[in-house]
Amino acid sequence: MPNRDTLFSAPIAKLGDWTFDERVAEVFPDMIQRSVPGYSNIISMIGMLAERFVQPDSQVYDLGCSLGAATLSMRRNIKVAGCNIIAVDNSPAMVERCRRHIDAFRADTPVEVIEADILDIKIENASMVVLNFTLQFLEPADRLRLLEQVYRGLRPGGALVLSEKFSFEDADVGELLFNMHHDFKRANGYSELEISQKRSMLENVMLTDSVAAHKTRLKQAGFEHAEVWFQCFNFGSLIALKSGAAA
């Protein structure tokens, strides 16, 4: 059983900005399951997408890998030879635990876990790249640059999976889905205090975009095709494809 997230169950006098530190890493599996509707579905489907898109003798990238859930899902489903998964996160606490999680499962596809800024990672010979709830934590000015790097590094026929919390141009729809997400967290045992304190810590560091903004940026980066393949309330995932037959 994962450690239960009780980080914000008592009042915190001075709330700083959110960081993926040791305390968060320790309870992260419980936190994300109880906070992100559809998370388990996204993780399992990323594995199915890997079976479809990962090409022989190519690289697979999990950028902002946290504890490696997407990496493990892809590794379980990769059926071709000569692949290597590169999992990257800038949180030392996440990287340490991710390495332990990866080492606990045997598989043919090797995984390299790197502690680094994902903007500094050279994407090359990639058939699949995953950004699972990562882009929203980058400065908006850096987002297009990262997606351009991903596009350049993808092989023809390669895929990017981009999962995010969405904002909405229609205020009424945005309010409805915000409230449904609030209900989801309450139903999973979070108190009003926990919800409000976490939201206050995240508001300056997690800056969300609309689906339309994501699609526009993906097109600017070079992707010929992009569409939402999964959504639950204000959370979802897009797939973006680089045209051309797989090599």
Curated annotation (Swiss-Prot):
- Give the EC class as a word: transferase
Q: What keywords were assigned to this record? A: S-adenosyl-L-methionine, Transferase
EC number(s) given by UniProt: 2.1.3.-
List the InterPro entries.
Answer: CmoA, Methyltransf_25, SAM-dependent_MTases_sf
Q: Which SUPFAM superfamilies match?
A: S-adenosyl-L-methionine-dependent methyltransferases (SSF53335)
**Transferase: is it a keyword of this entry?**
yes
Gene Ontology biological process: tRNA wobble uridine modification
Q: Which reaction does it catalyse?
A: prephenate + S-adenosyl-L-methionine = carboxy-S-adenosyl-L-methionine + 3-phenylpyruvate + H2O
| Pfam families cross-referenced by the UniProt entry | Methyltransf_25
**Superkingdom assignment:** Bacteria
Among CDD domains, the record links this protein to: AdoMet_MTases (cd02440)
Q: Name one GO molecular function term.
A: carboxyl- or carbamoyltransferase activity
Q: Where does S-adenosyl-L-methionine bind?
A: Y39, G64, C65, S66, D89, N90, D117, I118, N132, R199
What is the protein's known function?
Answer: Catalyzes the conversion of S-adenosyl-L-methionine (SAM) to carboxy-S-adenosyl-L-methionine (Cx-SAM).
| NCBIfam families (alphabetical) | carboxy-S-adenosyl-L-methionine synthase CmoA, PRK15451.1
HAMAP family tied to this protein: Cx_SAM_synthase (MF_01589)
Q: How does it assemble?
A: Homodimer.
* Protein family according to the UniProt entry: Belongs to the class I-like SAM-binding methyltransferase superfamily. Cx-SAM synthase family.
- PANTHER family membership: CARBOXY-S-ADENOSYL-L-METHIONINE SYNTHASE (PTHR43861:SF2), TRANS-ACONITATE 2-METHYLTRANSFERASE-RELATED (PTHR43861)
Q: What is this protein called?
A: Carboxy-S-adenosyl-L-methionine synthase
Underlying gene: cmoA
